[in-house]
């Protein structure tokens, strides 16, 4: 009897195996027809849902798992072309495809552009912006699973072998133009390097991205810097908002993305050198941060999103440990905590961004201090606000005032409120 049951199981497995094999063969034989059907479906969907014309001049499979396309074009009706690419060649991981995942093994693309245009008649990408969902299902998202799924899908679309050539991102906001032209981008053996030409109405520069990228192990360490002399300038914002900003280099490191016990951990660091920003509403001169680094440990759970307290922010010689979280398990609770370990008061003063706190510039102090902040806000119970601020001083003395002589607060001085006439104020 047992032998008969075993034979039935073996026979069933063989039948399923043969059916699967026949299914694979059928898919392989008719794959070009299926591809054309898929393109037709996408074309109709673009016209129906996005009021846009989508076309591919030529598309065919190459080899066992390769796909080649030519003449990809996406044009919203009565608007400027949104996307155009001359050629794309890619290979897909066959076994991941059977598991329901699209994972790119290689990607070669050249000669194309993505164009974002705003005119008095509207924007050519409005139809593709996510629409606000007004239907409340009452279901809370599981933040850990949601973010992990998005990261996995995104990283699966990053190939391990990539060659991009002559691709551009063009932006035109009512005449305010910026073009980021990707001359080349190569990812081979986990090493990535690119050359980018930037052109705006106000400047032209050449940028470079170089470093390590391993999408399958979810790790990267890349550096972004200027090929030419001088700082990298941030495009578009100078014309659009009057914000002039620049920096020497940016580094991004992702060392760990891991789901453990229902919680998602994302760890790494990012840093920037010689960051400068100028805008009249920020300060009357350049604000400069010479060195800044953020060692981050993001944590996502079923009901919360947090920057863990093991994270560290370095600002010149100063460092502090932030904790920021949002929790909606019962109520919507926002938490902000910050801890500055014991440090020299003078190091704190010299670490402040240059130009932002001008009254501290030139100030000298002796002694040490540490600081702790605890802020908890329950949106559903605002009266239960928690705010604790604790400064512990150790022989803390201001030995020299900076640009502003704060000792004048002990005497008579002229005070001019915006809504009143000038008057003398005396502090007793």
Kindly label every feature range from the protein language model.
Residues 2-51, 283:
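N-terminal type II signal-anchor transmembrane helix
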Residues 58-130, 141-170, 190, 195-223, ...:
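Flexible beta-edge/linker motif
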Residues 81, 99-102, 178-253, 261, ...:
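Interface amphipathic segments
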Residues 158-169, 229, 272-274, 391-393:
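Tryptophan-anchored aromatic micro-motifs
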Residues 222-223, 266-268, 334-336, 385-387:
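Transmembrane beta-strands of outer-membrane beta-barrel proteins
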